[in-house]
Amino acid sequence: MHLRIHARRNPPRRPAWTLGIWSLFWGCIVSSVWSSSNVASSSSSPGSHSQHEHHFHGSKHHSVPISIYRSPVSLRGGHAGATYIFGKSGGLILYTWPANDRPSTRSDRLAVGFSTTVKDGILVRIDSAPGLGDFLQLHIEQGKIGVVFNIGTVDISIKEERTPVNDGKYHVVRFTRNGGNATLQVDNWPVNEHYPTGNTDNERFQMVKQKIPFKYNRPVEEWLQEKGRQLTIFNTQAQIAIGGKDKGRLFQGQLSGLYYDGLKVLNMAAENNPNIKINGSVRLVGEVPSILGTTQTTSMPPEMSTTVMETTTTMATTTTRKNRSTASIQPTSDDLVSSAECSSDDEDFVECEPSTANPTEPGVRRVPGASEVIRESSSTTGMVVGIVAAAALCILILLYAMYKYRNRDEGSYQVDETRNYISNSAQSNGTLLKEKPPSSKGGHKKQKNKDKEYYV
């Protein structure tokens, strides 16, 4: 009896590339989760920062923060300007140039946002050093906005005559001066212009020139030319007064984003600039109103400094109605500053619509603005799209790997080593198996073919 050993090949081990597929799959999952967490943290960081700032205001001096709302204009603007509210009893913000840094200018640019209901008051006044007499004043007279300035001879006045501005709405006024020429514009209304008619001194000199001895003509002419040059320069500017209290013409309402020849005076006041003094009924938006009958200190404490927001700030307008005051919140931006810095008149302005906002409690996160909602929604959309794309890619790779694994070669074979094993093995009774001598050639071939087995 022949003992046949059929050896079946062991199943092949899993190829190394399948391990790579699984590594790639888990790598995709981990990377998608990591990227989504980064996007979520980046989108939530501005909100958390603003929440921390509001909590700081509440815990520092227990003020009621004003909700910040962003307008389409503020989305285009750069940095926002600070807003101050001037009460009924009047107030004053006074900026004084250092004695060794007082400018003399041939041209000036002034811009400010305001809202008020008073018929008369001084918004801003710039004065030269004592004894010179040069000044520039922005004021409201009979409900209409105007500017009067004097740079050495007579007062030059320019005014918006068409429409009153004491309607309680928010307006932006811009004034430019170049020598004796001046322009004044309110919002996007038509521009008011002023051009001097001529040099009166030169005209008079030409009339009496022939009566003056010849040897005196040259010195007098040079003196008149030098005087004419001086009449175009605002000499040795010393201080900027905001609010009109020092002149007895009190302004009541709100002022925002004041810009004058590169100085953002209200921002400097909010940042506790040492050259600025504040007294009277003046309150920075976001602070606790002072007790009636008391005045603020002449210098601002550090607690009154405000955080300059990215694009916009809110402004509150106070309107006294039978001992009751209501505040309306309106958005603004530094578009008025940028328009004051450039001389082009083709800039567009969006009319500020008054809107009311309920103040939030200290430490409570403010309502997000339109730009924040857009930024958060776009971040969420990007995160979802990234996760879905990564998951789809991983699923496709996994399906392809499973397909290749199922269609691999599953063939097997068996090996018959009967002849070799029998010739070398012992019988069960201990005797060796003796092969029979081949009887014939045909019988040997038959036996050989009989012992062979083939498997496919």
UniProtKB/Swiss-Prot annotation:
Residues 1-35 form the signal peptide. It holds the Pfam family Laminin_G_2. Glycans are attached at N181, N279, N323, S339. PROSITE patterns: LAM_G_DOMAIN. Residues 325-340 have a biased composition (Polar residues). GO terms for biological process: angiogenesis; cell adhesion. Keywords: Angiogenesis, Calcium, Cell adhesion, Cell membrane, Cell projection, Glycoprotein, Heparan sulfate, Membrane, Metal-binding, Proteoglycan, Repeat, Secreted, Signal, Synapse, Transmembrane, Transmembrane helix. The chain crosses the membrane at residues 382-402. GO terms for cellular component: cell projection; extracellular region; plasma membrane; presynaptic membrane. InterPro entries: ConA-like_dom_sf, Laminin_G, Neurexin-like, Neurexin-related_CASP, Syndecan/Neurexin_dom. Residues 52-63 have a biased composition (Basic residues). Weakly interacts with CBLN1 and CBLN2. Very weak binding, if any, to CBLN4. Specific isoforms bind neuroligins NLGN1, NLGN2 and NLGN3. Interacts with CLSTN3. This is Neurexin-3-beta.
